[in-house]
Swiss-Prot record:
Keyword Phosphoprotein: no
Organism (species): Deinococcus geothermalis (strain DSM 11300 / CIP 105573 / AG-3a)
One Pfam family it belongs to: DdrB
Keywords: DNA damage, DNA repair, DNA-binding, Stress response
Region named Disordered: 139-178
Induction: Induced to high levels following extreme ionizing radiation exposure. Also highly induced in response to desiccation stress.
Subunit description: Homopentamer; arranged in a ring-structure.
GO biological process, one term: DNA repair
Record-linked InterPro entries: ssDNA-bd_DdrB-like
Amino acid composition bias (Low complexity), ranges on this chain: 147-165
Protein name per the record: Single-stranded DNA-binding protein DdrB
Domain free text: Contains a novel ssDNA-binding fold, which is structurally and topologically distinct from the OB-fold universally found in standard SSB proteins. The disordered C-terminus of DdrB may mediate interactions with other proteins important for DNA damage recovery.
């Protein structure tokens, strides 16, 4: 029997028994849909393959998608809203990085120094997750979702924002009201 410790959306610690390792992600999804989290976000954010970004199951980390009043799709996690940012590939003498999608937010003065990342100027930010390179992991996808076609570009933030508002009123029965 495995045990996983969650922090509820109200800050209570709860230990849940898991029958076997192959049931672990199902349990994380179940409680993650309630906004419960297990563990801390690693410095630099969670790392996932880029191919998982379009249908990533945010409940695995206790997060969910949310559309703000301006129609921008964001990710809510532990009371913070994270923006989607597309990062271009870097190919220089010093560094070579493939294109990526990052979910981050502006740092707050209450954020610990070790999670803050420097940007241009004096601006600092905190990363929740970054999707870059790697091979797709089906276990990270929303169960039953249609896998995005290989080579199909992800919708840009502008395209999503234009079409996001009409669909924002649809609410699933399972969704929590936070």
């Amino acid at each position: 029997m495995l045990h996983i410790e969650f922090i509820t959306d109200l800050g209570a610690k709860v230990t849940v028994d898991v029958e076997s390792a192959d049931k672990l992600l199902d349990v994380q999804r179940q409680y993650g849909r309630l906004g419960w989290t297990s563990g801390e976000v690693p410095v630099g954010g969670y790392q996932f393959p880029l191919e998982n970004e379009p249908d990533f199951d945010w409940s695995l980390i206790g997060a969910r998608k949310w559309t703000n009043p301006e129609g921008e799709e964001m990710i809510l996690h532990r009371g913070h809203a994270y923006r989607r940012r597309e990062l271009e590939a870097v190919d220089s003498r010093k560094m070579k990085l493939p294109a990526a999608v990052k979910y981050s937010r502006g740092a707050k003065n209450t954020d610990p120094e070790h999670v803050r990342e420097k940007a241009d100027g004096e601006f600092e930010y905190v990363t929740l997750a970054i999707f870059r390179g790697g091979k797709r992991q089906e276990r990270y996808a929303v169960p039953g979702s249609n896998r995005p076609q290989a080579g199909a570009p992800a919708r840009s933030a502008a395209t999503r924002a234009q079409g996001a508002r009409p669909g924002a009123v649809a609410v699933q029965d399972e969704e929590t009201p936070f």
